[in-house]
């Protein structure tokens, strides 16, 4: 992990708008949505001249920074509970939907060739299954040549919303995992051979580097790095591959407007084509922000993303929020933020 350093990712582009109207916004948090936030920010800069400096430091870091009021908005894949939002004077809304995928580095195995269910995947990540030659893996993959070798588990080194989504799924499908490891942004991984990586990019780098390893990353990182992913058995009993269609299928049954604070996990969702480790990434804003001009620009940024950023999201295999949800956000969340 020595080469993985805490970094601030500065997003900029050539300004096509008058400098007098430009605003320098700041945000921090989840690495899960960083690829699409970068694309949206570039397009928003070209249209308005306003910059976004987004620190991709992990969901726990984003929550800490917004609570410390050092950024204009926080970003987290691990939704903040409604009571906590109320106590802190904040609002929360989902900005984008994506999928977390298990990725591996096993010689001779192609993407999607290995199929697993939730309990088996959970046993791998808690060290109950420690070799790729384990008969439980073989039984689920008849005809697939999987070479034996000790499994190295790659996890997030810091508090992470991606970890929260992933462990929420594992805990829902494995009682052993739920009771032994539990779900959360930062858990104690019991597997003897465990390696940490900073951010989704750090996990992707370590899985790529370490032979016979397995990790979990947001799908855009797996796709960008041409990683080998595992197909999973969903709640309906079907093996599915990760992509924007299976993520959308998983999210289809969620009525965000009826959830206090709009915060929920959508893992292990019903549906024939649902990807079981699907999640949303959330934005946190103060109702009465110290810098109201910047808060107004943040709202304009996400309104722009909702209206003009759908194609950009789909190109990276994210799922844009449905129109009904973004309309609800405009009327019931944005209006609670004081911008003057």
Explain the meaning of each model-derived region.
Residues 1-10:
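Bacterial N-terminal signal peptides that target proteins for export
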Residues 10, 15-16:
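Alpha-helical transmembrane segments
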Residues 16-22:
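Sec/Tat signal peptide C-region and signal peptidase I cleavage site
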Residues 22-340:
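Flexible loop/hinge segments at secondary-structure junctions
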